[in-house]
């Protein structure tokens, strides 16, 4: 069991001093009761609210974000907006970070967490967790591209693992990768003289971006969804 002020500070990013002040002011409830004691011990199943915002009670937090354009995949940046800025107070914790990167102009599924072990399991190259993207290019999608992706395209940093390209329109397709090199999809299409104009991540492992999650919105992942993300590890 942990002190109430410590939990609030760790899971919201506010200082311990401000956490104590909020508790003393009666702004914090634990399982429906106003608690004014900073050293109150919080149980594993207790629900904590700071004002109207619920504070997650799990040991770690796992967030799915529908990343919009214009945000960089970083915890902080002095000149650009980061994906962490999209996380609302009820989900924020000290130490959260984006598990993997999406370019500033790339949209779609992103996982934010404070669990380094989980991030390693889904991102390590040897785990081969598949990631699917919807892609739009400025040239027609060809059979040559499909064959090239399947056979493995040679880039400046080596030959890519086999990737699946499924044509969905004259200029659109879905690409599934099991690795994550720098600007990989853009570079792969560049080998055919094509430029990627839109890139949107649809899924990781067996988990797809929820259709009702609008750009810029996020929510906590359920245990079932976490299991789906890891369901294809090492396949």
Which role fits each region the language model picked out?
Residues 1-235:
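Basic, flexible Lys/Arg- and Gly-enriched helix-loop patches that mediate nucleic-acid binding at interfaces
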């Amino acid at each position: 069991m942990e002190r109430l002020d410590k939990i609030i500070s760790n899971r919201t990013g506010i200082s311990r001093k401000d956490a104590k002040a909020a508790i003393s002011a009666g702004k914090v409830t634990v399982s429906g009761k106003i608690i004014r004691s900073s050293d109150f011990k919080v149980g594993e199943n207790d629900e904590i609210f700071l004002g109207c915002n619920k504070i997650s009670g799990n040991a770690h937090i796992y967030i799915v974000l529908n990343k919009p354009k214009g945000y960089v995949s970083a915890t902080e940046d002095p000149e650009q907006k980061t994906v962490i800025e999209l996380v609302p107070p009820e989900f924020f914790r000290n130490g959260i970070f984006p598990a993997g990167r999406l370019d500033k102009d790339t949209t779609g599924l992103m996982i934010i967490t404070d669990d380094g072990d989980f991030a390693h399991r889904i991102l390590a190259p040897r785990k081969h967790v598949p990631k699917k993207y919807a892609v739009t290019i400025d040239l027609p999608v060809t059979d040559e591209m499909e064959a090239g992706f399947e056979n493995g395209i040679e880039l400046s940093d080596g030959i890519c693992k086999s990737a699946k390209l499924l044509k969905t329109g004259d200029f659109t397709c879905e690409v599934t990768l099991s690795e994550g090199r720098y600007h990989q999809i853009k570079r792969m299409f560049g080998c055919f003289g094509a430029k990627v104009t839109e890139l949107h991540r649809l899924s990781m492992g067996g988990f797809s971006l929820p259709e009702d999650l609008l750009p810029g919105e996020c929510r906590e992942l359920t245990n079932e969804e976490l299991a789906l993300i890891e369901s294809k590890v090492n396949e």
